[in-house]
A protein has these predicted regions:
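Conserved beta-loop-beta element that borders a ligand/cofactor-binding pocket
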Residues: 181-202
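Glycine/proline-rich active-site loop of Rossmann-fold NAD(P)-dependent oxidoreductases
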Residues: 152-154, 203-209, 235-244
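Non-catalytic terminal and boundary segments that flank Rossmann-like NAD(P)-dependent oxidoreductase
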Residues: 1-41
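N-terminal Rossmann NAD(P)H-binding glycine-rich loop of SDR-like oxidoreductase domains
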Residues: 43-63
């Protein structure tokens, strides 16, 4: 019986990985002109109190951007800067989302949550509101963090994540990320979906692999939140991955 259970579980994990791949975005050819407007765009950052979000805010300010952070609890964002505006709101509330999007040039999303053990649409419904507000306000570009393990990157977080973490701990979370990606791809905005490996709190190396096919089928791949933020902000000034979903890892 234990062998039967083990075989059944492995088949479930593989089936889930295949399903995430089929339901997610396919691999696509990246744009090649590599150019974007030279002017420093004004940024709205959502998910700004999370690990990647804090890095996005700090690094964007260091690069000279004007930054608006939409957060549920402003006291959790312990950054003060003359070019930082903090708005209290929730991505589930369209009115607060539209107010935050108004006047921006780019929206950068590092949305996340810790409600792993039940069905949820926090990511997808929040993203739906962001895209709706962007289209209403004429904001062109959207940079969004999701994860390796979805779409064409299914299975590329390594065996441990493919066979255990995703199917046992994070299946609902990854299904919602898959819905999130499909909403973005169906929108009219200029988008880049960034799929990182397993996130760490190490410092920024500034050197990492990025491509729609990065990752490993065997070994767990990692990258720091600081490097993910660096790569996401680089997409403000480049069209290389426009309307594609590159992975990023060390």
């Amino acid at each position: 019986m234990p062998i039967i259970v083990l075989v059944a579980f492995i088949l479930y994990a593989i089936t889930l990985s295949v399903a995430l791949g089929r339901r997610g975005l396919p691999s696509a050819s990246a744009a090649t002109d590599g150019t974007a407007p030279a002017q420093r765009p004004r940024l709205l950052i959502v998910g700004a109190t999370g690990g990647t979000g804090r890095q996005l805010v700090a690094q964007a300010l260091d690069r000279g951007h004007e930054v608006t952070a939409l957060v549920r609890n402003p006291s959790r964002l312990e950054i003060e800067h003359p070019r930082l505006r903090v708005l209290q709101g929730d991505v589930s509330d369209y009115a607060s989302v539209e107010a935050a999007v108004r006047g921006q040039d780019v929206v950068v999303s590092a949305l996340g949550h810790k409600r792993f053990f039940g069905p949820t649409r926090i990511l997808s419904e929040g993203t739906r509101n962001l895209l709706r507000a962007m289209e209403a306000q004429g904001v062109a570009r959207f940079i969004c963090e999701t994860s390796l393990g979805i779409g064409s990157s299914a299975g590329r977080m390594g065996l441990y994540y493919t066979l255990f973490v995703i199917p046992v701990i994070l299946p609902f979370y990854f299904w919602d990320k898959t819905r999130q990606e499909r909403l973005i791809a169906a929108s009219s905005v200029e988008w880049v979906i960034v799929r990182p490996g397993v996130l760490t709190n190490q410092g920024k190396r500034g050197s990492y692999r990025h491509d729609p096919r990065v990752g490993s089928l065997i070994w767990t791949v990692h990258i720091s939140r600081a490097d993910v933020a660096d790569f996401m902000l680089n997409q403000l000034e480049s069209n290389t991955y426009l309307r594609t979903a590159p992975g990023v890892c060390w």
